[in-house]
Amino acid sequence: QVYANPIAYSTDQHGRTYVNSKSGFLISVQPSRSTSRGSVNIQSPNVKVSPLINANSLNTKDDQLMAIKAGRMIQQIANTKAIKSVTKKAFDVNFMNLDDEGLLNSFREFASTVYHPCCTCRMGRSINNSVINNKLQIHGLKNIRVVDASSFPNITSGNINAPTMMLAYRAAEIILEDNF
């Protein structure tokens, strides 16, 4: 998924992203079918202690090749007459002259999740490879269900808003069937 934002972002010394006060835009790519898998682990019985989250981005060769291909595509778009006519200079990193390794390093440094996490409580048949069953119940428990994008067994090819609404609609039907 390629998108352009009419705003520019920068990253501070602590790795936090902020909106740059200067006029700018962003051309970006969001791979829709990542093959890398991360993890979310509980590190304490204390609910106030955050879980350990490892996105594990760009861990597979397929994802690395996709990032390089995406970087090359962004370079081609940025090199068009139309984009060049409205561009003075790059804010943080000039992607135009990066080789494959440079593109990967840049993606590792600046990439983010775009706030659409899913598949962390995966639906499946077995407790060995999933958290919930096909009725959205946590394996081994009857009255607790997971009804959000975390229950998807696989990430969708695009934004997850509509599939999440469809899941919620189906979950309501399942809950009514089970209780009436």
Where do the protein language model's features map onto the residues?
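FAD-dependent oxidoreductase catalytic-site/capping-region signature
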Residues: 1-163, 171-180
